[in-house]
Amino acid sequence: MNAVIEFRNVWRHFDRQPVLRGLELAVKPGEVFALLGRNGAGKTTALRILLGFLEPHTGEASVFGVPSGALMPAERERIGYVAEGHRMYLEMRVRDALAFEAGTRPNFERAAAERELERCGIPLRKRIFFLSRGQRAQLALILAAAGAPDVLVFDDPAMGLDVVMRRELLGSLIELLSERGCAVLLSSHILTDVERIADRIGILHGGELLVDAPLDELKRRVEKRQWIPSNGAGLPELDGLLRARRVDGGYELTLLDLDPLDEARLRAKAARLSERIALDLEELFLELTTGEETHG
């Protein structure tokens, strides 16, 4: 199945500083891709390039095989977008927001949106200003989904919501995805939510995509080992070494895709090499995006 979202060698600079460095990723229909990264990693920039709000300096982002900047109105109608903060006209009533969407988006399913709003307990007559944060987030999701999109793009949709609000929003999103089967590109800081919904995870750091894989595969590929050298031996050069943290008598190593030859090098100089220590998503994320390697 062909990808409907693609980034091919995308670079973008601000003030001559690279924010994206050769970004490559693809999302197929029915797939949820979660793009993770610390603040300033380039997540929002990537989404804005995909939606045609920014141009890449090198490379290309495309949707439905069409470069983002060349998408026609009919193709844009097939894309739903929910931005961080759920920016809306706060003085509008909910029913006015529905009327606006129906007037500007030919595929907008107003009756379906009204049914979903009723299910969520959001009154049509209420001004958006007086909705809770959670209700605004649900309204933004319903408006994006009611256009029958083939692609959904979310930029931190649960930012600022409490646990209960996030759970309700995530439940709505999971239900929506099961019905639609659309391709989803999601950026988020909330790792527990990502674990529930994502088919694949990409971790962006310093504008580079460090990994791109299903969570179970990432957990297999990234590991920790305790390494105690024999007779004062130095730490060997390892292609997959992410971090080496000094501990009593040796190092705690974080390794990506440790190959048998590197493991043999470690064992040859080890008084003790522990078995692999598996990481959860939060530990994996922190190991990939914080700290520096220590050698010596």
List the predicted regions and their residue ranges:
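ABC transporter nucleotide-binding domains
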Residues: 2-7, 12-205, 209-211
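Generic alpha-helical secondary structure signal
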Residues: 18, 73, 111-115, 216, ...
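Residue-level marker of structural boundaries
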Residues: 81, 122, 224-227, 290, ...
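Short loop/turn segments at beta->alpha junctions
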Residues: 93, 214, 277-280
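Residues that form generic nucleotide/phosphate-binding pockets
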Residues: 116, 172, 221, 269, ...
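Short, surface-exposed beta-strand/loop "edge" segments at domain boundaries and coil↔beta transitions
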Residues: 152-156, 233-235, 260-263
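ABC transporter nucleotide-binding domain
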Residues: 170-258, 275
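C-terminal coupling/interaction segments
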Residues: 249-296
